[in-house]
Amino acid sequence: MNKGRVTQIMGPVVDVKFDGGKLPEIYNALTVKQSNENGSMNLTFEVALHLGDDTVRTVAMSSTDGLVRGTEVEDTGKAISVPVGDATLGRVFNVLGDAIDLDGELPADVHRDPIHRQAPAFEELSTKVEILETGIKVVDLLAPYIKGGKIGLFGGAGVGKTVLIQELINNIAQEHGGISVFAGVGERTREGNDLYHEMSDSGVIKKTAMVFGQMNEPPGARQRVALTGLTMAEHFRDEQGQDVLLFIDNIFRFTQAGSEVSALLGRMPSAVGYQPTLATEMGQLQERITSTNKGSITSIQAVYVPADDYTDPAPATTFAHLDATTNLERRLTQMGIYPAVDPLASTSRALSPEIVGEEHYEVARQVQQTLQRYKELQDIIAILGMDELSEEDKLVVHRARRIQFFLSQNFHVAEQFTGQKGSYVPVKNTVSGFKEILEGKYDDLPEDAFRLVGGIEEVIENAKKMMA
């Protein structure tokens, strides 16, 4: 066994000297196992740099409290490896693939894969495009998701990214019954705990593997936990031919963790203090999330937008990799419209007549045109009032407000907070509902009847109650 000794500790970054002249390879896992009067220590490091002839600089995967210079370190000879396959379903893991739930250890013979690997070769990639129905009206109509695509949920703090992810897990697991992998990257432990219990209660957990490296973990764990989840998803895709859903909450924390260790590793910061390797790190992760001839990975990633600034390098780099974006807007939460998805800023490459069909495409574009015109008229309304508008513009405003409210709906996962039953709306019902609103079929119904409902039949029911 190749052994070395700790020579320097800088928080999560540790230097290790190997005297034998044989340095561990980049990405190799090094371990420390020792006992002293303060208890036992079991640490894993990952090699990041070679310094000179005999020293490596490593990043710790857990807290380095209590570690001292001179401690013996062992080279495992391979990268961090995590359990994969059916044994992972229904379980919760940390970045190293250790089970952290209360269901005991995994069987000793469980198969393990290294977390670092190459993206699939060009000729292995699949090119077919198929829509993934989510049951969420605003998403299915205006920025539909692609099976095997990459989807980003963009938004600032507290606008509902995690709730939207939880609803997608619930809807897709209930309706499509596929396997899901959830990677909690640098987010709140409470949310992870809530999600685990909700999924246990609904039975969805049996088809899900969960991996967590939360806010309180050192940056090494937060940077690598997304790769741990991805490795588990890749096994289901490549070895079992499954269509897998990979949820990452939050991909910004992956970048943030990289920037935390970057300066300690001796790299010169680039724009806004981010690591110079930002685009490379993001590319290495994102290129592995793809569909092959064997199966698909559809990934849904929450992207925190610092200070609501979309030009920040972290969200801007993420944009380049996505097939669809769902933008959450604080202005809509203030109006009580949930999910607070911006219908004009959200995009999808699937919104074309060849993929969604002529009718769906036409209805979606008309909805966007109506909302865009309403947005343009809002300044005039604020200054001069509604009465100064032409009859045609009054009708646009009248319908746009109904459309805006009809884009909202109650979520199953928010039932305990709202007391309202959640709704799942099939795409064809969504398209026909908006088509009828655009045609003026419901111009006589009160605006509030359209708020937080599922299908158009609920609107009619609400209107009857209001008029009674």
From Swiss-Prot:
GO cellular component entries: plasma membrane; proton-transporting ATP synthase complex
SMART domains noted in UniProt: AAA (SM00382)
Entry EC number(s): 7.1.2.2
Membrane topology summary: Peripheral membrane protein
Top-level class of the enzyme under EC nomenclature: translocase
GO molecular-function term, one example from the UniProt record: proton-transporting ATP synthase activity, rotational mechanism
Compartments where found: Cell membrane
CDD domains found in the cross-reference section: ATP-synt_F1_beta_C, ATP-synt_F1_beta_N, F1-ATPase_beta_CD
Binding-site list for ATP: 155-162
UniProt KW keywords: ATP synthesis, ATP-binding, Cell membrane, CF(1), Hydrogen ion transport, Ion transport, Membrane, Nucleotide-binding, Translocase, Transport
Superkingdom to which the source organism belongs: Bacteria
Reactions catalysed according to its record: ATP + H2O + 4 H(+)(in) = ADP + phosphate + 5 H(+)(out)
Quaternary organization: F-type ATPases have 2 components, CF(1) - the catalytic core - and CF(0) - the membrane proton channel. CF(1) has five subunits: alpha(3), beta(3), gamma(1), delta(1), epsilon(1). CF(0) has three main subunits: a(1), b(2) and c(9-12). The alpha and beta chains form an alternating ring which encloses part of the gamma chain. CF(1) is attached to CF(0) by a central stalk formed by the gamma and epsilon chains, while a peripheral stalk is formed by the delta and b chains.
Function in brief: Produces ATP from ADP in the presence of a proton gradient across the membrane. The catalytic sites are hosted primarily by the beta subunits.
Family: Belongs to the ATPase alpha/beta chains family.
HAMAP family per UniProt: ATP_synth_beta_bact
Protein name (database record): ATP synthase subunit beta
Species of provenance: Bacillus cereus (strain ATCC 14579 / DSM 31 / CCUG 7414 / JCM 2152 / NBRC 15305 / NCIMB 9373 / NCTC 2599 / NRRL B-3711)
Lineage: Bacteria, Bacillati, Bacillota, Bacilli, Bacillales
